[in-house]
């Protein structure tokens, strides 16, 4: 028997909790058509100072879980995950921005092999998302696509369905609003099968709790550090290549000047030469640091390196087994150039 547990984290949502809970409960017949035998709805009151808990407790079909004090969006979701009894777990916000009517579509994908199904607000359906947040979500989705080497259109969607078994692979997760982008980042790097289903997005009920600047910074920091813990060379390697690219451009410019008969460098050319030298040294060192960190990550997790800068790692055998020929190559290169 397939059970779907839907978790709604709620903080000061007395005006909207009844409507969203009622809409979730109303999709039960469609869930059964999609292959879900039973659905449970958990509302996690995250220390609300209004009547959210009181209102939710009076809704038939709702299991209320309470935090004595506010712990954060992510903490409320994790409490719900721990209380859920279903092998499928879904969640959405309490503010009415996400359409629970799309849960059957998400569940079909999950029952057909996907391990994490994300309702994408950026994949074509009608969206009332503010322009600033739309730009931010596009940026984070593009960043995650680069870091995880898989196309992602919405890295921070708050409507998802996933199989319970993936929790052990994507934990730990943060307590704040950055839970969703970190979940996406971990899932990509853990090789979890992800699918996206286009969903509409509505204007929220009440005032938004999301700050574009503050939470955007937290999202970026969380995603970068999470990716670094799996594949450091993906980030450091790109930085190193960019630095060496700058050095290459400077070199081409100096070669161009020399080809045109310039034999004396002015102050700007000297500064460019210095920039090129610094960029070369910095690029090589940062790139090498990324490779070293990847090796340390593999040692820490006691697993072989699965990823590299452009996908699969360059060295399938441990890096220390490559030091001999790498050293000889370096010596020969030095003798030739010298």
Model-identified regions with their sequence ranges:
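Hydrophobic helical membrane-anchoring modules
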Residues: 1, 178-338
């Amino acid at each position: 028997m397939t059970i779907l547990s839907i978790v709604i984290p709620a903080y000061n949502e007395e005006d909207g909790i009844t409507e969203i809970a009622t809409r979730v409960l109303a999709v039960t017949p469609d869930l059964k058509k999609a292959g879900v035998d039973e659905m449970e709805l958990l509302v996690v009151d995250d220390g609300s100072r209004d009547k959210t808990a009181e209102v939710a407790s009076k809704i038939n079909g709702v299991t209320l879980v309470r935090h004595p004090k506010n712990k954060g969006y992510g903490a409320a979701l994790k409490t719900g995950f721990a209380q859920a009894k279903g092998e499928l777990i879904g969640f959405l916000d309490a503010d009415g921005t996400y359409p629970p009517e799309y849960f059957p579509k998400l569940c079909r994908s999950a029952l057909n092999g996907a391990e994490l199904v994300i309702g994408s607000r950026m994949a074509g359906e009608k969206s009332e998302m503010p322009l600033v947040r739309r730009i931010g979500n596009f940026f984070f989705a593009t960043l995650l696509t680069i870091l995880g080497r898989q196309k992602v259109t919405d890295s921070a969607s708050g409507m998802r369905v996933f199989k319970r078994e993936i929790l052990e692979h994507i934990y730990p997760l943060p307590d704040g609003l950055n839970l969703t982008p970190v979940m996406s980042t971990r899932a990509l790097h853990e090789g979890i099968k992800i699918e996206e289903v286009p969903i509409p997005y509505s204007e929220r009920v009440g005032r938004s709790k999301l700050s574009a600047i503050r939470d955007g910074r937290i999202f970026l920091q969380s995603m970068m550090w999470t990716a670094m813990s799996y594949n450091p060379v993906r980030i450091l390697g790109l930085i190193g290549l960019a630095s060496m690219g700058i050095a290459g451009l400077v070199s081409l410019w100096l070669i161009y000047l020399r080809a045109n008969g310039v034999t004396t460098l002015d102050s700007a050319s000297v500064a460019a030469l210095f920039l090129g030298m610094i960029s070369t040294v910095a690029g090589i060192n940062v790139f090498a640091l990324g490779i070293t960190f990847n090796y340390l990550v593999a040692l820490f997790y006691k697993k072989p390196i699965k990823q590299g800068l452009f996908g699969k790692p360059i060295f399938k055998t441990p890096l220390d087994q490559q030091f001999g020929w790498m050293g000889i190559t370096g010596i020969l290169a030095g003798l030739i150039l010298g």
